[in-house]
Amino acid sequence: MLAFTLRFIKNKRYLATLAGALVIIAGLTSQHAWSGNGLPQINGKALAALAKQHPVVVLFRHAERCDRSDNTCLSDSTGITVNGAQDARALGKAFSADIQNYNLYSSNTVRTIQSATWFSAGRSLTVDKKMMDCGSGIYASINTLLKKSQNKNIVIFTHNHCLTYIAKNKRGVKFDPDYLDALVMHAENGKLFLDGEFVPG
């Protein structure tokens, strides 16, 4: 009987400990959403809060490619589709609701230039061919843009292999971005840090 009582007490303590741990985990999950790829999700409000502390860098993959879709092309066959342009415009409106002040850059391809143009709805765009080359040198290129922008927030339209490289290099995760997916970085003391994946909303 005594042995049974001790086992019962131990089980109750174990269950109480387990329940407490689950409550803590649930609390953490409610405060920090995570993507299935292991990257933290950063919505517009979180991005705006981060931008108050440091210059942020948001790197978008371009919109839907015309040459890999049956949808209607916007114009040039090497550019984006009409649907892609409309998606970029809608995304830009949502983004600007939280981040109004930023400088805009893109690589030197038609699809990234069109994506950036529709995203920004007329904002001045600077084309930089270095945003096409994505290896270890990408960070120096981004820091150069930050200096040109006088450490303002910057938005860059680039390519999936760039985002994949950064996610793997900075956080060791596999990131296979869809059209208009984005990564969020911030600059601090001359260094770039990957904060997570941008999720509109």
Swiss-Prot record:
Q: Which GO terms describe its biological process?
A: lipopolysaccharide metabolic process
What are the GO MF terms of this UniProt record? phosphatase activity
Alphabetic keyword roster: Hydrolase, Periplasm, Signal
Q: Which pathway does the record list?
A: Bacterial outer membrane biogenesis; lipopolysaccharide metabolism
Quote the CDD domains the UniProt record gives.
HP (cd07040)
Per its UniProt record, what InterPro entries does this chain match?
A: His_Pase_superF_clade-1, His_PPase_superfam, LipoPS_heptP_Pase
Q: EC annotation?
A: 3.1.3.-
What's the top EC group for this one?
A: hydrolase
Primary localisation category: periplasm
Q: Where in the cell is it found?
A: Periplasm
Signal peptide location? 1-35
Q: Which GO terms describe its cellular component?
A: periplasmic space
**What functional role does this protein have?**
Catalyzes the dephosphorylation of heptose(II) of the outer membrane lipopolysaccharide core.
Q: Which family does it belong to?
A: Belongs to the phosphoglycerate mutase family. Ais subfamily.
Q: What is this protein called?
A: Lipopolysaccharide core heptose(II)-phosphate phosphatase
Q: Which organism is it from?
A: Salmonella schwarzengrund (strain CVM19633)
